[in-house]
Amino acid sequence: MLKIDDRIDNRHRITGRLGQGGMAEVYEASDFISKKPVAIKIIKEQLCQDKNQLDRFNNESKLCAIMSHPNIIKVYSRGEYEGRPYLAYEYMKGQTLNECLRNSLMFSLKEACYIMLQLCDALYYIHNHNVIHRDIKPDNIFYNTNGTIKIADFGIAYDLQNPSKKSEVVGSVYYMAPELCKGETPTIQSDIYSLGITFFELVTGQLPFVEKDANEIAKAHLKKPLPSVHTFNPELNKNVDYVIEKACAKNKENRYVDCMEFKKDIQALLDNKDNFVQKRNIFKRVFGLK
């Protein structure tokens, strides 16, 4: 465990402890170069000999280094400290969406749509870099005090440019696309499904499938119809159901083509317009409209 005032690579000084997960510890630190507070994520000492955990941490380090987007956590530096790999990234003043949900139960539709617009932008950028996040959920999304959304945790992200890497059933089963529950290769539509489940939770304060164990939840993703958001929040109309059901279609071919198409329907919800992708596509086919 790091201590207050420990120096990391003569660039960072530990100023506090922020928490820990299953794989890493997270500390607050000052950056001698930028003069700004940063977060230091360092793999736990006991996991340094665990190849799978090291690969996961290094995968996150590599992929984060190529990302530069206002809605993705920015990594400033990476390296090793006493044989333990670490990441130094921007310090977030705020909470995860999961913490927000636990504190306020759910977001208004307007608030949720503003969050979703940012998430669609960030995921579109990630996908254009040939990366599938694979772990989109409120716990991996920061809600800054200025309203900015930041996606974090690329530990199990799938690099489409490295197809030899074995696809595994990893991630949170509550947000897992049906095809991933079956061990299939991740795609853009897999992230879109997880984003749709996240949207469902933002506007209802509930998860669509809460079963007795992980296997039953996976079966629900595969076979059970998505419950209507109206059941949990009577103020929401059928258009919200339409958007979430399209994002979370059991067959990935029936989901949004990409996050920009998803974003257009989120914007239509925000503008209270009855002009959604499926309807636009019908007009295109019948009248040749754009």
Where are the model-predicted features located?
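Conserved short submotifs of the Hanks-type protein kinase catalytic core
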Residues: 82-96, 100
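Conserved catalytic-loop aspartate of Hanks-type protein kinases
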Residues: 191
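Protein kinase catalytic-loop region centered on the HRD/HxD motif
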Residues: 121-131
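AlphaC helix of the eukaryotic protein kinase fold
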Residues: 44-66
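Activation-segment/catalytic-loop signature of the eukaryotic protein kinase fold
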Residues: 78
